[in-house]
Regions:
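Intrinsically disordered, low-complexity regions of eukaryotic proteins
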Residues: 20, 25, 30, 36, ...
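Outer-membrane beta-barrel pore domains
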Residues: 20-21, 26, 42, 62-63, ...
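Outer-membrane pore/translocation modules
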Residues: 58-83, 167-179, 210-336, 412
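Glycine/serine-rich loop-strand microenvironments at binding/catalytic pocket rims
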Residues: 99-131, 192-260, 323-358, 362, ...
Length: 462
């Protein structure tokens, strides 16, 4: 009888041949050659989108202290004779702070682009009530390998656009920020960053950027309202603000429009790391520095106050801080340690800003505990982990001299902030963080005051 068997190398054609013995014993059939599915092309163009939202319950302690500035009567609420620094929005509040759209594109391992678009942006807005509610937080393209990826030999990269400072802590374990992170590297800058890796341990990085303007904000969740159109006495007599000034510190604010005229900020970093990045077992140290010339003024969205020298000079250039020149310099060192579920981040900074000195340091310890599988939903574990976190930060301005009537004496205060909290995974892509900020400020007369805050954050990602 006839049987049909594939022929090896026959291009998929079958050959018919007589096999008389097949009726008795069966015929051996040559095995078919299995087609191996090709793997994904590592050089293919890929695009990925993501989304994140954050909802909160915030409870802020009430604190009200007199401002030494002689506000004109028309700029004060009806019947008031004195201006005050006051908690931005005391009491308990439910609020949606941000909706974020992410977009990532890559073309092989050496070309990558990233965009991060924020909507609402409540906790980044400054002033809180009048700043823009949409922000292009990051927008950059990188040529060369990922600087965080392990490299056996020499490698270089260049990144251009709007991106975070290279020394910034990008894996913060709370929703809040420490004093040092708030003051020096919370917000992105825009320009050019170049880096080089030398084997697996040593790397260099440098940047040439626009430079974040100097402004002030409260270190708690809400930045506060200072210089808003609603509080402008030339537009509204005796305004009654819904949000208050807060207790602002000087900080590097968000860059607004692209401006590369004049002096740019230069940054340098020298790093040393051990262990494989992303493996959970890594130690990394980075020494870094920035310097630039401050502008006479910088226009900022939502406020009639100017940034840089204009802010430091005070109203009418008569009630300023003790500034000399326009140099702005920072020198710092950062340490990251990862060991399994344990992580540590530390940062120390010395700053000279228009002849005034300021130092600060902070350290954050977190430990993630993976929980055993007890419940699941939709094939995903419920309550997969717990992560307690503690952070201590300290900021010491040395701004002696100048006018005692500068409107925000809080920029001169010695400040300590202890943040402690717990992050709990609810299900993949959803977590809950409960944290408490214990603020202690030392006033000019040596007395101490507090401006504490409880913050609960429900974060969802997809």
């Amino acid at each position: 009888m006839l049987s049909v068997a594939p022929t090896v190398g026959g291009g998929g054609r079958a050959a018919a041949q007589e096999t008389p013995a097949a009726d008795a014993a069966g015929a051996e059939v040559a095995p078919a050659t299995e087609a191996v599915a090709p793997g994904p092309d590592p050089n293919a163009f890929r695009v990925h989108f993501g989304f994140e939202g954050k909802a909160h319950y915030r409870d802020s302690e009430q604190l009200r202290l007199p401002s030494p500035f002689p506000f004109p009567p028309e700029s004060l609420p009806p019947g008031a004779t004195q201006g005050f620094l006051e908690s931005v929005n005391e009491g308990g509040h439910f609020e949606l702070s941000v909706l974020t759209l992410f977009a990532d594109a890559s073309w092989g391992p050496n070309i990558e682009a990233h965009a991060k678009l924020d909507f609402i942006d409540l906790y980044d807005r400054n002033p809180t009530s009048s700043d823009k509610q949409f922000d292009v937080d990051e927008l950059w393209i990188r040529f060369g390998g990922d600087p965080a990826a392990p490299v056996d030999g020499f490698g270089m990269y260049a990144r251009v656009g709007k991106f975070g400072h290279f020394e910034r802590q990008n894996d913060r374990h709370t929703e809040s920020y420490g004093l040092v992170s708030t003051a020096f590297n919370r917000f992105e800058d825009q320009g050019l960053e170049i880096g080089a890796n030398f084997g697996g341990h040593f790397y260099l990085v440098g940047s040439l950027t626009q430079g974040n303007p100097v402004f002030f904000r409260d270190p708690n969740a809400l930045a506060g309202d200072n210089g808003t159109p609603e509080n402008d006495p030339s537009l509204h007599d005796h305004p009654v603000p819904e949000l208050q000034s807060g207790f602002p510190i000087l900080y590097d604010a968000e860059v607004e429009d692209l401006d590369v005229d004049g002096d740019l900020e230069t940054g340098y970093g020298l790093g040393l790391r051990f262990g494989e990045p992303g493996s959970g077992h890594e130690v990394s140290f980075l020494a870094w520095a920035y310097q630039r010339k401050m502008a006479e003024t910088v226009a900022l969205n939502g406020t009639f106050y100017g940034g840089d020298i204009d802010l430091l000079n005070g109203p009418q250039n008569l009630f300023g801080l003790p500034i000399h020149g326009n140099d702005k310099k920072e020198v710092g060192g950062n340490l990251w340690i990862y060991q399994g579920g344990f992580s540590f981040f530390g940062q120390y900074v010395q700053q000279e800003i228009a002849g005034m000195d300021r130092t600060g340091y902070e350290g954050e310890v977190a430990w993630r505990f993976d929980l055993p599988l007890a419940w699941a939903a939709g094939g995903r574990q419920l309550f997969p982990y717990l992560q307690p976190v503690v952070r201590y930060s300290f900021l010491k301005p040395e701004f002696a001299g100048g006018s005692p009537r500068f409107p925000a004496p809080s920029v001169r205060w010695e400040w300590t902030k202890l943040d402690y909290g717990l992050r709990m995974g609810i299900i993949e892509g959803v977590d809950l963080t409960i944290e408490f900020a214990d603020n202690e400020m030392t006033l000019a007369n040596g007395s101490k005051v507090s401006n504490d805050e409880l913050l609960t954050t429900l974060r969802f990602r997809m």
